[in-house]
C-alpha cells in the first residue's frame, strides 16, 4: 500500500496540488464496511474540503460510494470516487465504479517466474506493472 500512497503523492505533485495529510483516512481493513466507515470519518473531519476520493481498493471505494450517497452527496456531480483493483462488482454498482484495473493474469505469470527464480537461488526482483484506468460513472470533471 506504500507504493499506492507514493503514487498518489506523485500525481498530486504533477498536478500542482499540495499534499494534505488531513485528507488521508486509513481504513481498518479492505472490506466494504471499512470503506463506509472511513468515508464517514473523513467526511466528519473534512466535509466540504474535498471533491474526490481515491480508495486503495475497489471494496473500500464501494463503501465510500454508499456512505457518500447516504450523506447527501450527488455522485459524481458533488463527489467523484475512484477505486483500485478492477473487481467485477464495481461495474454493476450504482454509480458504476471508476477504477484502476491491474493486469492480474500477467501478475500471476510473473509471480510464478519469480518464485521459480527464488527456488533456483536467483536474486529477488521488484516489478512495477502498467495498470489501466477504467472510466465509469463514479467520476466526473467538476462542472459536468
Language-model region placement:
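Bacterial carbohydrate/catabolite-sensing allosteric modules
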Residues: 1-144
Amino acid at each position: 500500500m506504500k507504493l499506492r500512497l507514493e503514487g498518489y503523492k506523485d500525481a498530486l505533485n504533477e498536478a500542482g496540488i499540495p499534499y494534505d495529510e488531513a485528507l488521508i483516512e486509513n481504513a481498518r481493513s479492505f472490506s466494504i464496511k471499512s470503506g463506509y466507515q472511513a468515508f464517514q470519518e473523513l467526511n466528519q473531519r473534512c466535509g466540504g474540503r474535498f471533491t474526490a476520493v481515491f480508495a486503495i481498493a475497489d471494496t473500500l471505494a464501494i463503501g465510500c460510494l454508499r456512505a457518500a450517497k447516504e450523506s447527501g452527496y450527488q455522485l459524481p456531480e458533488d463527489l467523484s470516487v475512484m477505486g483500485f483493483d478492477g473487481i467485477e462488482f464495481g461495474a454493476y454498482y450504482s454509480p458504476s465504479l471508476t477504477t484502476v484495473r491491474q493486469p492480474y493474469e500477467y501478475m500471476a505469470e510473473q509471480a510464478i517466474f519469480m518464485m521459480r527464480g527464488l527456488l533456483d537461488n536467483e536474486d529477488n526482483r521488484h516489478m512495477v506493472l502498467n495498470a489501466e484506468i477504467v472510466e465509469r460513472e463514479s467520476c466526473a470533471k467538476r462542472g459536468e
